[in-house]
């Protein structure tokens, strides 16, 4: 099993995959323009409240997902750090497992995955975490596509302090 080491989530490190806004530094209005990126096919805005469960034990990633028509934004509602895992798509459209990166988002960070970015489901590090999620959908399905990994990936979070 391959192991990747999580590092703190920063806007600079995450820029190839989307955007990060930190509400702990909020002095004025924060614009989340990237939260509404989508294709012309995705015409229905979606806002969902999500109760996400933590993984038991050391995090092991066995699948990734992609939203081909829309960006996807998660706003934390609890004081829970979360694990963010992303990778590039290979030429065959499957996850390129050699490009997997892991980040630790603080409870004050809003994360937006750019449309077409492979990522793992949002995973809080506390027993559970509540999030508001927004994206666009087509209304005909195919808005979330799941891809299994050939080899599960373990994520080392031991060097990260939330």
Swiss-Prot record:
Pathway: Nitrogen metabolism; (S)-allantoin degradation. Catalyzes the catabolism of the allantoin degradation intermediate (S)-ureidoglycolate, generating urea and glyoxylate. Involved in the utilization of allantoin as nitrogen source. One of its GO terms (biological process) is allantoin catabolic process. It comes from Agrobacterium fabrum (strain C58 / ATCC 33970) (Agrobacterium tumefaciens (strain C58)). Keywords: Lyase, Purine metabolism. Gene3D superfamilies: Ureidoglycolate hydrolase. This is Putative ureidoglycolate lyase. Homodimer. InterPro entries: RmlC_Cupin_sf, UAH_cupin, Ureidogly_lyase, Ureidoglycolate_lyase_dom_sf. GO terms for molecular function: ureidoglycolate hydrolase activity; ureidoglycolate lyase activity. Its EC number is 4.3.2.3. It catalyses: (S)-ureidoglycolate = urea + glyoxylate. The keyword 4Fe-4S does not apply. Its cofactor is Ni(2+). SUPFAM superfamilies: RmlC-like cupins (SSF51182). Pfam families: Ureidogly_lyase (PF04115). Belongs to the ureidoglycolate lyase family.
């Amino acid at each position: 099993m391959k192991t990747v080491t999580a590092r703190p989530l920063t806007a600079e490190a995450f820029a190839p995959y989307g955007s990060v806004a930190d509400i702990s530094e909020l002095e004025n209005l924060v614009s989340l323009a990237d939260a509404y990126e989508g294709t012309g096919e995705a015409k229905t805005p979606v806002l969902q409240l999500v109760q996400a469960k933590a993984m038991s034990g050391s995090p092991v990633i066995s699948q990734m997902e992609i939203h081909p028509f829309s960006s996807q934004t998660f706003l934390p509602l609890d004081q829970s750090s979360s694990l963010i895992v992303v990778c590039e798509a290979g030429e065959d459209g499957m996850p390129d497992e050699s490009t997997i990166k892991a980040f630790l988002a603080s409870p004050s960070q809003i994360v937006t995955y750019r449309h077409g970015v492979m990522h793992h489901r949002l995973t809080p590090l506390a027993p559970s975490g509540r999030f508001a999620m927004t994206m666009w959908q087509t209304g005909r399905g195919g808005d979330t596509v799941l891809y299994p990994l050939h080899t599960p990936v373990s994520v080392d979070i031991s060097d990260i302090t939330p």
